[in-house]
Curated annotation (Swiss-Prot):
Function according to Swiss-Prot or TrEMBL: Catalyzes the deamination of various vicinal amino-alcohols to oxo compounds. Allows this organism to utilize ethanolamine as the sole source of nitrogen and carbon in the presence of external vitamin B12.
Protein name: Ethanolamine ammonia-lyase small subunit
Cofactor: adenosylcob(III)alamin
HAMAP family: EutC
Residues given in the record as adenosylcob(III)alamin binding sites: 161, 182, 211
Note accompanying the cofactor annotation: Binds between the large and small subunits.
Subunit structure: The basic unit is a heterodimer which dimerizes to form tetramers. The heterotetramers trimerize; 6 large subunits form a core ring with 6 small subunits projecting outwards.
Membership in a protein family: Belongs to the EutC family.
Subcellular localization(s) per the UniProt record: Bacterial microcompartment
A GO MF label: cobalamin binding
The keyword Aminoacyl-tRNA synthetase appears for this protein: no
Length: 272
């Protein structure tokens, strides 16, 4: 008669509670357990839905109006979602009508603001619907604290990151901030990205931009994203540059911790 043994401790259990990443899913024979397989299929469906979800700017326009912020609704050169996904280059430029509309806005209200803010659906309108309003509030508060002037917020359907260069150039802004839905992941269909470019001009490459990514409830908080943005903007204006020459060195104090008394890190796979 064999002696019963205690099942081995699942060393990954604690990590599974800390991350939505697909780790230690287990197995059923040579495949995944049914629950894990169904969760994967659901996440994949949510990511696909986020890519194809139509951008609805009306709620954001209403919020901006309540805050006393002017907004302009524009469209990229990609006429629909199908063309947007097939022709990334069209998502980087305004349509002719949108460009003319923005020129008219500059002629009437004047240009030369410190900051132009662009909100574009990108590859996840869901991210914009959920998080753009809160990040715009962070940007407005930062601008008020620093004394920076703001151009009207431009809301762009079928837009990609580089479209901010054209918007910033037409508005004659010192810098442009683009809030855009990031490519959905299998655990993050609603991740918002923020891109900063100093002296925006059509033709800039990604090397001219700074990125703050994964802004969402389960990722980077609005407050921390605003803190990073404040540092990058102050340095961009001081040094008159952005992109690869500007590194994010914003302080990140660990609240409630005493570094002197912290225990040495241990291997979570080893027994207690």
């Amino acid at each position: 008669m064999s002696t019963p043994t205690t099942p081995p401790r699942d060393a990954w259990a604690r990590l599974r509670a800390l991350t939505p990443a697909r780790i230690a899913l287990g197995r059923a024979g040579t495949s995944l357990p049914t629950a894990s397989h169904l969760e994967f299929q659901l996440a994949h469906a949510q990511a696909r839905d986020a890519v194809h979800l139509a951008f609805d700017p009306a709620p954001l326009q209403a919020v901006l109006q309540q805050r006393g912020r002017r907004s302009v609704l524009l469209h990229s050169a990609a006429s629909d979602r199908h063309l947007y996904l097939q022709r990334p280059d069209l998502g980087r430029r305004l349509s002719d009508e949108a460009a003319e509309q923005l020129r008219g806005t500059t002629a009437v209200h004047g240009g030369g603001a410190d900051l132009a803010v662009v909100v574009a659906d990108g590859l996840s309108a869901l991210a914009v619907h959920r998080h753009a309003g809160a990040m715009l509030e962070q940007i407005d508060a930062l601008a008020a604290h620093e004394g920076w002037s703001l151009a009207p917020v431009t809301l762009i359907a079928q837009g990609r990151v580089a479209i901010g260069d054209e918007v910033g150039e037409l508005l004659q802004a010192r810098a442009v901030i683009v809030l855009i839905g990031e490519r959905p992941g299998l655990s993050s269909p609603d991740s918002l990205g923020l891109y900063l470019t100093y002296a925006p001009r059509v033709g800039h490459t990604d090397a001219a931009r700074n990125c703050i990514s994964n802004i969402r409830g389960e990722g980077l908080s609005y407050a921390e994203a605003g803190h990073k943005l404040g540092y990058l903007l102050r340095e961009a204006f001081r040094r008159k540059l952005s992109g690869v020459q500007l590194k994010d060195e914003a302080d990140r104090p660990l609240l409630g911790t005493d570094t002197a008394s912290q225990a040495a890190p241990r291997n979570f796979l080893l027994p207690e």
